[in-house]
From Swiss-Prot:
Cofactor(s) required for function per UniProt: pyridoxal 5'-phosphate
UniProt similarity note: Belongs to the class-V pyridoxal-phosphate-dependent aminotransferase family.
Protein species of origin: Helicobacter pylori (strain J99 / ATCC 700824) (Campylobacter pylori J99)
Protein name: Uncharacterized aminotransferase jhp_0673
Residue list for modification N6-(pyridoxal phosphate)lysine: K184
Lineage: Bacteria, Pseudomonadati, Campylobacterota, Epsilonproteobacteria, Campylobacterales
C-alpha cells in the first residue's frame, strides 16, 4: 500500500531504521548530546531563538502555546477543523476568544484580522494555520503576521505550521510561536510536537508559570540543559537526528523545498489535465486537494484496486474531497504512480477515458520538458 495521506505520512526505510536502534536512556549524557544536536538543527531550520520538543501530538503544542502566551483574549482564524481547534482550546481554558470564520477554500484576509484587533483591544494573542490541512489551504501567514506586528507589536502571533514546516521556507520575522508535528514532513509516527519561539515569546513564558505537563517555563529551563521535564520522546528524537542527515544528503533544506514544490506543482497540473478541480483558492504545497462528487468512490477504488491510499475530507466535505500528500522525502516515481492510478480509477468509474494524461503532464512539468 502506498500511503499518500497528509499525515500520518509514509515512513521510508531510512526513517524506520532509526527506530531499530538500541534504546538509550533519556537521562544520560549520550542522549543529551543527541537531544542538543536535534534542537540546534531545529533552530536553524525554523530561524527562531528557541525550540522545545514535547511528547504529544501537534494539538498538545497548540494548547501549550495558547495557555503560555495568551493572558487576556485570543483571536483565531477558523477555515477548517484545525483552525476551529484553537477556539476549542481557548474554551477549555476559559480564555475569551474571537473567531474569524472563512470558507474552507478561502485564505484569511489581512483587513478582517486588523479590524478584529482594533475592535477588541484586549486581544493579546492571534492564532492561525500556515496550511489548514482540512482543505489544503495556504494562508498568507507572513503577510498577516507583519500587519499585526505593525498594528500592535504586543500581540503574540502563534502559527500552526504542522503541515508547512519542512515543506517550504517560512518567513518567521513576525512570528512568536511556530508549531510542528512529527507525523508530517518529518516522516515520523505521531506523538512528538515542537514549538519554535521568538525572544518575545520566551520572555512571556519566563514571566508566567501555567500548566503542568505543558508548562513551557519548566521545559525551557530543562531543555536549555539538554533534557526534558518529563520522559523525552526518545525514539522520535533519534528519528529527527536521522531526518536531518537525510536532508543534508539531499543537499539541504533548499533542495528539499525545491523538490517538494516541483512535485506539488506538477501534481496540481496533472489533476487539472484530468478535468478535475483543485479545491482551495490558495493551494498549499504540502498537498493537492481535489473536490469532486465522486471523491468517496475514487478514494475507495484507489485503495482497494491500486493500493494507493489518499485521504478524504472532513465534515462537511467528508465525501467530496481527496487530499494527496507531498510532505516528506517521496521518490518521484511514487507520485507518478499515484497520479496514474487516479487516472485509471477515473476510467474504471467511466468518468474519463484513460490516455496517460496524468503521467505525461506530471512528468513534463516535473522535468520542465
Amino acid at each position: 500500500m502506498l500511503l499518500f495521506t497528509p499525515g500520518p505520512v509514509a515512513i521510508n526505510e531510512e526513517m524506520r531504521s532509526s527506530f531499530s536502534q538500541p534504546m538509550p536512556h533519556h537521562r544520560t549524557k549520550d542522549f543529551e548530546k543527541i537531544f542538543q544536536s536535534v534542537r540546534e538543527n531545529l533552530k536553524k531550520m525554523t530561524g527562531l531563538e528557541e525550540v522545545l520538543l514535547l511528547s504529544s501530538s501537534g494539538t498538545g503544542a497548540m494548547e501549550a502555546s495558547v495557555i503560555s502566551l495568551c493572558q487576556k483574549e485570543l483571536l483565531f482564524v477558523n477555515a477548517g477543523k484545525f483552525g476551529e481547534r484553537f477556539g476549542k482550546i481557548a474554551k477549555a481554558h476559559s480564555i475569551k476568544a474571537h473567531e474569524l470564520v472563512y470558507e474552507w477554500d478561502t485564505p484569511a484576509q489581512v483587513d478582517g484580522i486588523l479590524n478584529a484587533l482594533k475592535a477588541n483591544p484586549n486581544i493579546d494573542a492571534f492564532c492561525i494555520q500556515a496550511c489548514e490541512s482540512s482543505g489544503g489551504l495556504r494562508h498568507p501567514v507572513e503577510k498577516i503576521a507583519q500587519a499585526i506586528k505593525e498594528t500592535n507589536p504586543n500581540v503574540f502571533v502563534i502559527v500552526d505550521a504542522i503541515t508547512a514546516l519542512g515543506v517550504e521556507p517560512l518567513e518567521i520575522t513576525h512570528v512568536d510561536a511556530l508549531i510542528g508535528g512529527s507525523q508530517k514532513a518529518f516522516m515520523l509516527p505521531p506523538a512528538m510536537s515542537l514549538i519554535a519561539l521568538s525572544q518575545k515569546a520566551i520572555d512571556r513564558i519566563e514571566e508566567r508559570n501555567v500548566g503542568f505537563y505543558f508548562n513551557l517555563k519548566s521545559e525551557l529551563k530543562n531543555q536549555k540543559n539538554n533534557t526534558t521535564s518529563y520522559t523525552a520522546p526518545i525514539l522520535h528524537t533519534l528519528g529527527l537526528q536521522r531526518y536531518f542527515e537525510l536532508v543534508q544528503n539531499l543537499g539541504g533544506f533548499e533542495a528539499l523545498y525545491q523538490e517538494t514544490k516541483r512535485v506539488a506543482l506538477a501534481s496540481q497540473k496533472a489533476v487539472l489535465a484530468l478535468g478535475l478541480k483543485i479545491f482551495p483558492k490558495s493551494p498549499s504545497l504540502s498537498m493537492t486537494t481535489i473536490v469532486s462528487e465522486h471523491a468517496k468512490e475514487l478514494k475507495n477504488l484507489l485503495k482497494e484496486k491500486y493500493q494507493v491510499q489518499f485521504a478524504g475530507g472532513q465534515e462537511p466535505y467528508k465525501d467530496t474531497l481527496i487530499r494527496i500528500n507531498h510532505m516528506g522525502i517521496i521518490p518521484v516515481y511514487k507520485s507518478a504512480y499515484a497520479l496514474n492510478a487516479l487516472e485509471l480509477a477515473l476510467n474504471d468509474l467511466d468518468l474519463r477515458e484513460f490516455d496517460g494524461m496524468a503521467n505525461t503532464t506530471f512528468l513534463k512539468q516535473y522535468y520542465e520538458i
